[in-house]
């Protein structure tokens, strides 16, 4: 459900949201489990490979429904959590800065940012969790507390952080905790993860402005950016590449075509 906006002026975020969101929830929950090796992380012991696959798939879908709390992954440890909770130590290219956002399924969120003039690169991945080097399957359990995020590289001479914040607020409903549309789970929570004090200040000010436009409470978390784990290549620029069905969507700068998120 989109945010309930108190303002319907021609400059309100509602109009921008309608252009970027393309209606309703993302519905990206059907990504096939085809990615990196699981490294035996939390499937219970079973007698056959087929049973293991079935159990794992069931747990992944429980995670999608927010029911994946299994008491933590056996791969999780204090050392693993400390690594995952460390700062993002990557560095952007000269003249660029990083920004990081969680706003539901990262496929559609990434495409929205790809279209922003001045954005030079986007990556989808996992962050803010308690497991070092998680896989998509790990995150889908809901037990690692990672968020699906987009790390945006932007040219500071051509794009301002405020421009990215505008896209962030327009792209999703920031009032639904751990949910966007049909996608339910902590990996779909709303978050702005800042790299500099200036980004933090801008994020908090923008939240205050957005809250005045809404009649529901914003639940967006604003936290320091933590270690970024790039998602499997399958997920990168997923919609621009056409996804599973080959329906490519434009990543052209300034494009306002509705974003259709599909598995």
Curated annotation (Swiss-Prot):
It comes from the Eukaryota. GO terms for biological process: cellular response to oxidative stress; response to oxidative stress; response to salt stress. GO terms for molecular function: L-methionine-(S)-S-oxide reductase activity; peptide-methionine (S)-S-oxide reductase activity. The keyword Plastid applies. Residues 1-75 form a transit peptide. Gene3D superfamilies: Peptide methionine sulphoxide reductase MsrA. Its main location: plastid. Induction: By salt, mannitol, cold, high temperatures and methyl viologen. It is found in: Plastid, Chloroplast. This is Peptide methionine sulfoxide reductase A4, chloroplastic. It comes from Oryza sativa subsp. japonica. The lineage of its organism: Eukaryota, Viridiplantae, Streptophyta, Embryophyta, Tracheophyta.
């Amino acid at each position: 459900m989109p945010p309930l906006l108190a303002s319907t002026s021609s400059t309100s975020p509602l109009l921008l949201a309608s252009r970027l969101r393309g209606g309703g929830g993302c519905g990206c929950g059907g990504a096939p489990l085809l990615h990196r090796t699981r490294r035996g992380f939390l499937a219970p012991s079973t007698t056959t490979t087929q049973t293991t696959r079935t159990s794992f798939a069931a747990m992944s879908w429980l995670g999608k429904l927010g029911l994946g709390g299994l008491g933590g992954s056996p791969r999780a440890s204090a050392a693993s959590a400390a690594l995952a909770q460390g700062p993002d130590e990557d560095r952007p290219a000269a003249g660029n800065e990083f920004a990081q956002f969680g706003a539901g399924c990262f496929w559609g969120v990434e495409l929205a940012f790809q279209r922003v003039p001045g954005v030079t690169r986007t990556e989808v991945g996992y962050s803010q969790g308690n497991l070092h080097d998680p896989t998509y399957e790990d995150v889908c359990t809901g037990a690692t507390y990672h968020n699906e995020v987009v790390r945006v590289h932007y040219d500071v001479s051509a794009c301002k952080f405020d421009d990215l914040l505008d896209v962030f607020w327009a792209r999703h409903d920031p009032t639904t905790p751990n949910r966007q549309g049909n996608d339910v789970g902590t990996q779909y929570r709303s978050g702005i993860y800042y790299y500099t004090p200036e980004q933090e200040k801008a994020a908090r000010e923008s939240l205050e402005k957005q809250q005045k436009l809404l009649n529901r409470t914003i639940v967006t978390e604003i936290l320091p950016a933590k270690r970024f784990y790039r998602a499997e290549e399958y997920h990168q620029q997923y919609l621009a590449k056409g996804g599973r069905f080959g329906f490519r969507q434009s990543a052209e700068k300034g494009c306002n075509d509705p974003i259709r998120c599909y598995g």
